[in-house]
Amino acid sequence: MTAYIQRSQCISTSLLVVLTTLVSCQIPRDRLSNIGVIVDEGKSLKIAGSHESRYIVLSLVPGVDLENGCGTAQVIQYKSLLNRLLIPLRDALDLQEALITVTNDTTQNAGVPQSRFFGAVIGTIALGVATSAQITAGIALAEAREAKRDIALIKESMTKTHKSVELLQNAVGEQILALKTLQDFVNDEIKPAISELGCETAALRLGIKLTQHYFGLLTAFGSNFGTIGEKSRTLQALSSLYSANITEIMTTIRTGQSNIYDVIYTEQIKGTVIDVDLERYMVTLSVKIPILSEVPGVLIHKASSISYNIDGEEWYVTVPSHILSRASFLGGADITDCVESRLTYICPRDPAQLIPDSQQKCILGDTTRCPVTKVVDSLIPKFAFVNGGVVANRIASTCTCGTGRRPISQDRSKGVAFLTHDNCGLIGVNGVELYANRRGHDATWGVQNLTVGPAIAIRPVDISLNLADATNFLQDSKAELEKARKILSEVGRWYNSRETVITIIVVMVVILVVIIVIVIVLYRLKRSMLMGNPDERIPRDTYTLEPKIRHMYTNGGFDAMAEKR
């Protein structure tokens, strides 16, 4: 098994070297490192599409047909332990089958294999509308029913044989693997021990071995026996528990060696318990092995960025977290749903993403197009590992070298500095001490005059570029703002108080009373003046509307006129 994995690693490594030579030449990693952009060598891309189904039938109790009933008591005790483990699991499977009914609409003829699940219809959901979990359970149930006949045959065969491993291939090419617990141990050790050591001693040995196997069973299948859901299954645990090379048995010629290694490394093999037989103490697992397809000529690079220095100022280049490079394409990669192995990324779909044109040209080496932003806080990374050493912005950091913690500086004309085991050994950055790899080499690819693009806003709303100037302005105007605050605190204090409102009301009432008093006094004064001086009254005839002819009659006016005539 070890040699098999080593061959897979060698083949995958060779393919990766070829792809790296063809594709990674697009990305000038040396030039980007001088502005703090760190890009690794990259890994290949594989798409996990469909899967192959396999079934494993586990016989948990060995066939013990020893003379004089040796080991029978130990087997009974072992079965009682298994009942505690398997009865809840069987009840859950019975409940699932009661909730989901699968009907087959195809015609069953003699000699005609049963149709695949695509011919089956999920008919009735006892609790109402089918949820996604119920549909998934229905699929597993239908697949189990299709393989039920073959599984039943191999179960019957296992009860009649003393082999520890049996393999059956059904009509559609799917393999059913049967593993019998401790059968080789019973055949090779317990039976000979009866004649040599006696029945009692052999039975004790069998009891101890069964107890050990029970705890090994919990270790290998703890996640599967605890739920009927789909869980990752480690074939190495099965191989160790049943002393069989299950990896080679469970794979076919359609799965390449490098794919087998990636599947095992990332633990992508899923197992689900689909049947529990308490009469024979057998458990059936449905195992799904993903089929991987490698995308040729594609590498996914992991990218990161640290701050760098230009003329004493600290800047930061924004790059995608992962870069996908292809012969005619360079963009980002969304690996949210992907699994990373040592040599590849395994994704359910193509993870390629578009990135702005400026970022593409920046990654291709045109640093004048790199989107940069000025660093105004200490949250930006200051160092990173590369080629077994450390690349750091020593101007913005406190760096030491060696066990003596000797302070080191950086040329202000360089964006970053590279530290390795040869020129430093123990590296300290802002109090963090790092030991460089002894095999690491100097990652400086030559001093270059750095020219980067103008500072731009990397988000729709980004004020970080002017934050430093705004901070200085606020510091300069702090005294004036304090004075203005004091003035504003004084203004509005007198008319917003309760005492001020009461005072205003009292003043208005007093003014109103004074006005009323003045009017009354003037009226009385005028009246008293008219009553006290009657001679000064205006003659009545001056203002009367009576005709003056009346006065002529009463005052002798007509007599005077007659005398004149």
Swiss-Prot record:
Site (Cleavage): 116-117
Coiled coil, from the record: 142-170, 466-491
Family annotation (SUPFAM superfamilies): Head and neck region of the ectodomain of NDV fusion glycoprotein, Virus ectodomain
Start and end residues of each stretch annotated as Fusion peptide: 117-141
Regions that span the bilayer: 501-521
GO cellular component terms, A-Z: host cell plasma membrane; membrane; viral envelope; virion membrane
Membrane topology, from the record: Single-pass type I membrane protein; Single-pass membrane protein
Region (Leucine-zipper): 278-306
Disulfide bridges in this chain: 70-199, 338-347, 362-370, 401-424
InterPro entries, sorted: Fusion_F0_Paramyxovir
Cytoplasmic topological domain: 522-565
Residue positions with a glycan: 104, 245, 449
GO biological process: fusion of virus membrane with host plasma membrane; symbiont entry into host cell
Main location group: virion
Ranges per topology, Extracellular: 26-500
Post-translational modification: In natural infection, inactive F0 is matured into F1 and F2 outside the cell by one or more trypsin-like, arginine-specific endoprotease secreted by the bronchial epithelial cells. One identified protease that may be involved in this process is tryptase Clara. Unlike most paramyxoviruses, Sendai F0 processing occurs on the cell surface and induces a conformational change in the protein that unmasks the fusion peptide. F0 maturation is a primary determinant for organ tropism and pathogenicity. N-glycosylated; glycans consist of a mixture of high mannose-type oligosaccharides and of complex-type oligosaccharides. Glycosylation at Asn-245 is essential for membrane localization and F0 cleavage.
Pfam families: Fusion_gly
Signal sequence annotation: 1-25
Subcellular location: Virion membrane; Host cell membrane
Sorted UniProt keywords: Coiled coil, Disulfide bond, Fusion of virus membrane with host cell membrane, Fusion of virus membrane with host membrane, Glycoprotein, Host cell membrane, Host membrane, Membrane, Signal, Transmembrane, Transmembrane helix, Viral envelope protein, Viral penetration into host cytoplasm, Virion, Virus entry into host cell
Note, other: Sendai virus or recombinant F protein are widely used in cellular biology to fuse cells.
Function per UniProt: Class I viral fusion protein. Under the current model, the protein has at least 3 conformational states: pre-fusion native state, pre-hairpin intermediate state, and post-fusion hairpin state. During viral and plasma cell membrane fusion, the heptad repeat (HR) regions assume a trimer-of-hairpins structure, positioning the fusion peptide in close proximity to the C-terminal region of the ectodomain. The formation of this structure appears to drive apposition and subsequent fusion of viral and plasma cell membranes.
Comment on protein domains: The cytoplasmic region mediates the interaction with HN and M proteins.
Family: Belongs to the paramyxoviruses fusion glycoprotein family.
Complex formation: Homotrimer of disulfide-linked F1-F2. Interacts with HN and M proteins.
Name of the protein in question: Fusion glycoprotein F0
Origin species: Sendai virus (strain Harris) (SeV)
Organism placement in taxonomy: Viruses, Riboviria, Orthornavirae, Negarnaviricota, Haploviricotina
